[in-house]
């Protein structure tokens, strides 16, 4: 996979994220309208208080009585609460719907990239991306798009309102809005991007190290390596803490600068208003209204200033997410090809390598239909790689692999997957029951079908001996089961899938001779209806094959 620190510009990131909002546009518009109306109510609560003071002092006021002023304050306060709640509810509804959509897209990207682009990928880093990085985008969707629109409309409205009294205090107020809501966020975002990226990467590295430490805890305790592991966790935590401290320092600096700018803007508006009052160009009522407006109208604009620090993390997280979504798969999915039925396979002059190492060199072999073909060879000779090429997890570099007369690169991916079942040396299990873990090979399988597959895999008796039988939870990553039991679940899945081409990579490596014999007899029975490609080191396993090949140094003999 590409380096997730591929640096997109903030503008490019914003455009990509905003495009996703299109289906939710009516709700977004409603949130903006309610936000502007809510801030209007909040500001005029203060202004009505000023009118009450003018009325009580016997000065000219738009409101006839103090009671009228307090009545307006009460009504606007209630409206402010309702509008604020509705705005936030709308924004968060949009945010959580879009986060769900992004998670769906990320899961689709992971499926598209698997396995070629994800082999060797740090799982802790992936977990951090799928959880923390996507969750960080909530700030953009719930607290950025709508607040930015609200702030722009609000600043224009308040500037026009003050300009109604006089243009000079309005210009002073507008200058403050621009400094706090535009210049400050841009400045802080540019200066904070590197720190934010470093923090997100440090967080991902820490998650990876902790996850690795938890999974290897048994070995760490056995070999008394706890001190070194603890030191490693401490080092990662200190690095993460230093990056977080740098971020918080910047956030504190932005808050201080924001408050200072608001104070100077208010003083500027007051000073200009008093100067105009002395010149007779602005009444006392205007001085009070302009000053109170400056004091109470910065709420939406301050939200933008605070975004400057927060958005640096959002953009860093979005960059990582977009890097994954944009990653091109090694083997693009075929949807406009052929749905070629399996009628045997042929490997013609195939060469393949990765990481600068040639693994297979011009190998050729024929896999006849409804036969058991065995492949043996030393570890690292390319046996498992050949199986993955037949599954089209990678594409061959030279030569071709054919189903019948059709190159598998022209076979529709869905059709190819439906016709192949691969059992690897490591069986991945989900935190679910044994039955459901087997049933992922065929979701609509009846219980009788599941049990029949388990009998073929020498697993049924073991499952029935458990108190909950097929409803027994396997734990995280199948932690409650032995390696042999997990492997037999993988074999049972393949039998249940009922694909015409069965690829078995060391299917009995973790089994005793008794269970190996049961499975091999089942494989022999299955070859009446299926083609089986069997990879193994064991001579006893190879004895089940109709024809055998040996892979040595990337060549077949």
Language-model features, listed with the residues they occupy:
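Transmembrane helix-loop-helix hairpins at lipid-water interfaces of multipass membrane proteins
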Residues: 28-83, 164-168, 281-284
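Helix-loop-helix
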Residues: 55-71, 161-176, 250-319, 324-325
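Transmembrane helices of ABC transporter permease
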Residues: 23, 27-40, 143-198, 271-282
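An intracellular "coupling" helix at the cytosolic face of ABC transporter transmembrane type-1 domains
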Residues: 18-26, 115-118, 132-141, 145, ...
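ABC-type nucleotide-binding domain
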Residues: 340-557
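Short intracellular "coupling" helices and adjacent cytoplasmic loop segments at the cytosolic face
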Residues: 2-9, 90, 96, 104-128, ...
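Cytoplasmic coupling helices
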Residues: 89-108, 149-150, 173-218, 225, ...
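Membrane-integrated ABC transporters
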Residues: 1-42, 62-69, 87, 91, ...
